[in-house]
């Protein structure tokens, strides 16, 4: 049910944030965007986030470091990683760390939506709702 899902997009590329924001809003999701992992961690949106879509490589804190930090804070929101530099070692690390999906930019819209729906469903199942 998209209306209740809050998606946080964390990417240092403004064009990716805007395009992904527009796509998800058009599908009924509530979306918050952040230019860095640090900006997201400092926000009031941690507890309401249903899923995080994060770039792997950002200028300061990476998406993988963000996932580690979120888990250390007890936040279990699913993560979808997107990257312009797909690397098999990083993909394996991301999936072992608990990522729901790992997508190379540019990604097909339907693939992102499939990943998001699966991640949200898995998150609801884990929460028992």
What annotation goes with each model-predicted range?
Residues 35-36, 62-65:
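Acidic catalytic/metal-coordinating carboxylates
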Residues 14-32, 119:
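Two-component/phosphorelay signaling modules centered on CheY-like receiver
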Residues 88-89, 107-117:
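C-terminal output helix
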Residues 117-129:
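The C-terminal output helix
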Residues 17, 59, 87:
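The feature encodes the CheY-like receiver
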Residues 65, 86-101:
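Alpha4 helix (beta4-alpha4-beta5 surface) of REC/receiver domains from two-component response regulators
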Residues 55, 83:
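Active-site residues of response regulator receiver
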Residues 47-53:
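Active-site beta3 strand of CheY-like receiver
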């Amino acid at each position: 049910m998209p209306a209740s899902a809050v998606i946080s997009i964390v990417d240092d590329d403004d064009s990716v944030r805007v395009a992904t924001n527009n796509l998800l809003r058009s599908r009924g999701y509530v979306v918050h965007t952040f230019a860095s992992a640090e900006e997201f961690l400092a926000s009031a949106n941690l507890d309401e986030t249903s899923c995080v879509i994060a770039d792997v490589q950002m200028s300061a804190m990476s998406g993988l470091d963000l996932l580690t930090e979120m888990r250390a804070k007890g936040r279990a929101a699913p993560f979808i990683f997107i990257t312009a530099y797909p690397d098999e070692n990083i993909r394996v690390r991301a999936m072992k760390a608990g990522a729901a999906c790992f997508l190379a930019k540019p990604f097909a819209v339907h693939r992102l939506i499939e990943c998001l729906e699966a991640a949200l469903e898995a998150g609801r199942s884990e929460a028992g709702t």
